[in-house]
Amino acid sequence: TCLGVYILALKDGILKQFDQLKSRFERLSFVDAFWHLMVIDAITTREIAECPKNIGLTSFKFNMGYKGPHADLIGITATDDGATYKGFRMISALGPPSIAACHTENIDIHLMLRDELIAQGRKDYKVWNESRPPFVEAECMRRAIYLAKNANCPLYIPHITIAEGVDILAEAHRDGINVVGETCPQYLTHNGEDPAPILVEHPACACVNPPLRDRSSNERLWEGIRRSLIQCIGSDLAPATLAMKGDSIWEAPMGLGNISELLLPVMLSEGVNKGRISLEKVVEVCAYNPARVFGIFPRKGNIEVGADADIVVVDLAKTMTVSPRTLHSMCDWSIYDGWKFTGWPVYTILRGEVIVENGEPRPRAPGQGSYIPRNTLT
């Protein structure tokens, strides 16, 4: 019912383009959304101070894990530590609900390992994790948290993949640091030890940042959710068809497709029905916590008079087998192809209106979605 969307505002920043972007979004969208600004240059850094009061945007992403070929592919640059710390201080000065988000991977070590592995002729699916090993993520997580601590800046770390990440979050919470951890369905269910067939057949599909890890990381991340160390679940959706992925893992666009639509079935089937977490925990990490973290509560993530009446009705006994042919995405493959999930949404309700029933969108004209400003404007 409501998406958190990262905005890559190239050239002129977001403020000059905001009215145009908002108009286009609200003309085409079927659901609501709030936006995060990707801080990629001097312009977007300056805009941090203006976004909350001018456009109701209070979350800002720093790309510590991107430079080189993949950054060039999507038109972004890495944020060095000085620029990151400067941005953190600016966000701290804004006050709640403003928050920084960081993609945490040590990109310099990745690029060094990448060159070594390419020289060896490696192009199998396992090579992606080897080029971005767990310590690369752990080191950058610790660095981002340390910078945020010294700037007194709230920090959101998306798509955590590593077992050590749970320990890092526990240490930060013990030290009283305001850091929120997020993981994604794919990192709870998939790994390089039991690879999805599509990754073996088409290694370029394994190009996702951070990479899929190992079985022990899968279970430690579930533990992190149970212990409220990981407080949010995201999709990190980045769809690409097999043709777009191509034949080279080193040149493929990043991301795994068909994740958003399966986020809730994963949490219900692999989480609730297998006894890993409670249904209440699913509500907490998928709705209540994200709404509070990003300043859209109590309008979203909440059921009470005055809230938006965004509701999902689920059937914990409903069993279906996943196929890319029945999913609603441009992506023609899925790491979940053939998985049988028990626990599916049966009604999705946006602002009191049923918009999806038994997995099929109801006929509606586009333009039903709204941009959701944060509470700073109210």
Tell me what each language-model feature is.
Residues 2-5, 34-37, 154-159:
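Short catalytic-loop micro-motif centered on adjacent basic/acidic residues
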Residues 1-28:
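Metal-associated gating/positioning segment near the N- to mid-region
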Residues 43-233:
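Histidine/acidic residue-rich metal-binding segments in metalloenzymes
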Residues 249, 305-371:
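C-terminal cap of metal-dependent C-N hydrolases
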Residues 24-39:
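A glycine-rich helix N-cap at a beta->alpha junction
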Residues 7-12, 37-43, 66, 288-290:
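Acidic, glycine-rich active-site loops and adjacent beta-strand->loop/helix elements
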Residues 16-26, 113-130, 154, 161-181, ...:
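Short, electropositive alpha-helical surface patch
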Residues 123-152, 205-206, 224-233, 238-318:
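His/Asp/Glu-enriched, well-ordered alpha-helical/loop segment
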